């Protein structure tokens, strides 16, 4: 998750082909070898009101938008997979918005799985028995190198039969849009164009971080897409 600046500047399209790892020049082979998603990480970025990037209130507003948009588009939500579910902020929000939907939280952090009972797994290769109507991947992909992120996007598509909500910190966001004092910058920063290239063969961009699979029943008019 990232904290937006109070006064947002317009995002400019990315044109560079490289990516950066903020504050470090190392390139890990595995996410766990570079990043530690332990208790201290979640205390700083999610629990401490002085340093956290967001809380249940911000997820509630985001969930209200996603739910309203999917209802407008005609995309039913009966099953949800939340990759990188963290403290589980999406769970009560979705329970309120889609009370009959079945929620599955997937998390790579051993600490959080032990505490909250999430499914232990990675967005790179965890696979559900059946694809879900809604897949959430909120602030996860920037912790993966480009090869891992490419695999993860393919895995998101395999686990999704309807809509994907995706948020990832991009190079342009770090330079122009986010509050650097709260946003975790120790991540892989890739230009937004890189993500769009990976997503284009698999999803139709619907705006607002929502992407639709080809087999979604939702109907988009051409000006509603963000091609």
Question: Model-predicted segments: where are they?
Answer:
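Class I (Rossmann-like) S-adenosyl-L-methionine-dependent methyltransferase catalytic domain
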Residues: 13, 19-130, 144-227
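Hydrophobic adenine-recognition pocket in adenosine-nucleotide-binding enzymes
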Residues: 140
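Conserved active-site beta-strand-loop modules that form the wall/rim of enzyme catalytic pockets
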Residues: 133
